[in-house]
Amino acid sequence: MGGVAGLWAAGFARGEQTSSAPSAADEHPLPEYALQQYYTSLKQSSYDRSGGNSDRRPVAVGKTKEVFDIAGPGIISHIWLTIAAPDAYHLKEIVLRIYWDGNPKPSVEVPVGDFFGPNLGIYNVYRSAFLNCSSVKALNCYFSMPFRKSARITVTNEGTRDVGSFYSNIDYKLAPSLPGRTLYFHAQYRQKTPNPAVEYPAGAKELNLEGKENHVFMETKGTGHLMGVTLGVLQNAENWMGEGDEMVFVDDDSKPVITGTGSEDYFCGAWDFGGRDNSVPFAHLYNGAHYISSPERIGGRYSLYRWHADNPITFQRSLSILSSAVTPMTGRIAFTPRPIGIRRNPPPIFRRCLALLNVRRPSSSVRPTNYCPQLCQAF
């Protein structure tokens, strides 16, 4: 977790980092919690302002509810949400938006389920370094999100039925100042439904060096680094979906600077996650396939994540992440810290839920290939 804690939290406690050698007083074995801190810990929640115990906030159809609003400088350190709603697909229908420093365009604009990891509209218990879904449908995010002037969080009900109960607890710190190189958290959502296959002539070698027809995970411009990706896959064809190699293009390079060996390898698994008959879900600090159902079959589902906490992918001008041909219907998110900037709207609600409601075998003329990611950028 040093990629986030080192970039943001340490600077708040001690001031900006310098290149000078540490003094003898700074060379100590003490953890941060044993040292004096210079921030104020606070929380905004949905608690009952009357003093009663009715802490829920209903969100009517088509309405937006503000759940957080504070002046900076500061850092959001933890977001907890839980929802009771009659619609089975409310995780796809409720959109989370986060705004920094008064910018009218959100830096995060993602369906709630896709942001927290249950990206196929299904709650499942898992844990990782930055996101988790606890038992009884509690959603948690532990990415540090700094802001200089202000931070604002809203949720919008884009479904067709009222959300009866929306609860929130958002922990944050107010700090005297932030380091000059502080970056802002962004999350970019994309989906492809269905994701068409790439066809090769009969007998031709399946060569792909430049990613011209690859599936796009994420594209952005500016300066920052990629912290991680979440991916949701809904298969619309038989057999293994995950042989696509990831390709990472940095700062407008025409050729990838990083090329991987397959989708399950990028998510730090192997061998088709165990295959059609032996797949077992797993969830670790920095990688996981926390939901696997009916693998390698039409209607099969996968929820995956990968955090680059130990080695974020840095860029100065632009970043593109592609995958070799992808079979299934897809949705994905990328998390990146960077200056305030690029916005990408999620697709309309009917398209977000389409893959969950209607899985069909593709035309026999289409040879499906694999992959569907969800990305969360933190810039």
Regions found by a protein language model. Give the residues of each.
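N-terminal export signals
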Residues: M1-R14
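Beta-strand-centric surfaces of beta-sandwich/beta-rich domains
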Residues: Q17-C376
